[in-house]
């Protein structure tokens, strides 16, 4: 939080990120710092499960999803933030965090109506929530998750699940921690 996201934005731009989701730590210093970070990055910042219309710094500037093209294929990316972010960080009183399953399904429906049939959720809501989202939605192909620092592996006995964990037709992977995945 010392650099208020400036160094992270520079590095992420150099790495060529396609998009990212908002996690609770993006709100550690309030919406002002998140907006500064968003202005500094060259890619969309996503959050599907929050109403930011009452926060003028974010209203109209924070997308719920985006579409990228790779190899001639359209990929829909959806952002998912912890529903309890208002308890974990400092988003201020003007942002309302909502239930993740309905938020994700709403974006899946919009993307599929646009002809997108490959949907990836970028989640910072934790492994348990990611499993619930996979079980409660249709049309999500992959969830790339973080927040809970959950180790998934097919060889490590300490792992909390298989890599990938498959729920219905959705593959779930987790970022784990310290650059490991």
List where the protein language model places each region.
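Acidic, metal/ion-coordinating pockets
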Residues: 1-181
């Amino acid at each position: 939080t010392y650099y208020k996201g400036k160094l992270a934005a520079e590095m992420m731009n150099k790495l060529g990120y396609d998009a990212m989701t908002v996690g609770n730590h993006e709100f550690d210093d309030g919406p002002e710092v998140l907006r500064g970070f968003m202005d500094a990055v060259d890619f969309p910042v996503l959050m599907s499960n929050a109403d930011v219309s009452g926060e003028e710094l974010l209203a109209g500037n924070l997308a719920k999803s985006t579409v990228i093209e790779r190899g001639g294929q359209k990929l829909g990316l959806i952002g998912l933030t912890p529903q309890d972010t208002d308890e974990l960080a400092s988003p201020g009183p003007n942002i309302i965090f909502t239930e993740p399953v309905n938020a994700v399904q709403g974006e899946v429906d919009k993307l599929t109506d646009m002809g997108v049939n490959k949907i990836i959720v970028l989640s910072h809501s934790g492994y348990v929530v990611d499993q619930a989202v996979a079980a409660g939605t249709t049309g999500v192909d992959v969830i790339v998750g973080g927040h809970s620092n959950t180790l998934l592996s097919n060889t490590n006995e300490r792992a909390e699940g298989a890599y990938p964990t498959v729920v219905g037709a959705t593959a779930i992977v987790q970022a784990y921690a310290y650059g490991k995945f």
